């Protein structure tokens, strides 16, 4: 009998990556087949995120729906993983005693043994420890699911920003050995992956050991990945300004495989707020990085993260943030109203900003960046862009879909044989979240820089 696994994932790309690894692992060890239908599953897993507000409520709301399935099928196994699991631990079972497995981001590789334990003993198991990079040693060979692939290079974060829960839920920074990463990417390249997206809470903190001794920096790793045959594009998420080195900027100058798009979170344009956030850099230092990036890659486009309504944020602080947004001309952002995360220093700060004011500031910020992004998109109309065709369009299966170097989704008419290939497409229309293109007949030129 084929056993079925249903997994629901909240949060960042790292969580998406972890979930894909869980699927591959359990397929390998228990022959589980993935299903989108919770009602037909033998095991239900919830991979959680604690970054945003009401993460716990979201978790227990979902568990409440699954509880009904457990009553129908007592042999159903329910597991909770990810950052909320790491943060809450046994508290989850105190509120939901029907949960069988609780595992953290660093112990997902132990799921096969946890499942066996529950099956044999019918008793719950909790493992939210931090065994460094052990989980990567236990994972099966990566299975490509298209022409793009995520690869985790570093886990955790040591920066301890005052608002952030990541160091407490994913642990301190631990870099994977350089050769392990290169082996994984070579395996993916052999499966016709053309674009690699390197992942970490702070990728530019990467300091991986080499088998022959010594340390590999993030800049060096990028150069090594670019040298792998078949890998034509490299992206990465997320970076921190305090470790965005000149050596890393030089990689943008020398390495065409590294795309002309970077996500560099700043959170605020006020030095006073940045100090309260314990970000470790000033606005001027951030702008210096951007200036250097533009100098070596004039076509580069920048996205960022912003928190509005941080405790103590005044109108002047917010005005400085808006000034930075206009000056840098960000292409997009992930922006949110501040919400206190349990256990973080900022959770104890006095919050003087009303909720209505926070909402108004968020609207102003997002509207400004939306207009800037639309200007970038409009400027691309009539240009020829090099698209990596990722698959069929989500809205129209008769159309193909792919991304430009500057991370724009483009939908166009083509044949399925183009999936996994780079094609040149003329941009003929612009929408709020995508572009429409037309395949051009001359496909000789492999890359066309984004506008």
Swiss-Prot record:
SUPFAM superfamilies: Radical SAM enzymes (SSF102114). Keywords: 4Fe-4S, Cytoplasm, Iron, Iron-sulfur, Metal-binding, S-adenosyl-L-methionine, Transferase, tRNA processing. [4Fe-4S] cluster 1 binds at residues 12, 49, 83. CDD domains: Radical_SAM (cd01335). It catalyses: N(6)-dimethylallyladenosine(37) in tRNA + (sulfur carrier)-SH + AH2 + 2 S-adenosyl-L-methionine = 2-methylsulfanyl-N(6)-dimethylallyladenosine(37) in tRNA + (sulfur carrier)-H + 5'-deoxyadenosine + L-methionine + A + S-adenosyl-L-homocysteine + 2 H(+). InterPro entries: Elp3/MiaA/NifB-like_rSAM (IPR006638), Methylthiotransferase (IPR005839), Methylthiotransferase_CS (IPR020612), Methylthiotransferase_N (IPR013848), Methylthiotransferase_N_sf (IPR038135), MiaB_methiolase (IPR006463), rSAM (IPR007197), rSAM_horseshoe (IPR023404). It is found in: Cytoplasm. Monomer. This is tRNA-2-methylthio-N(6)-dimethylallyladenosine synthase. It comes from Baumannia cicadellinicola subsp. Homalodisca coagulata. The gene is miaB.
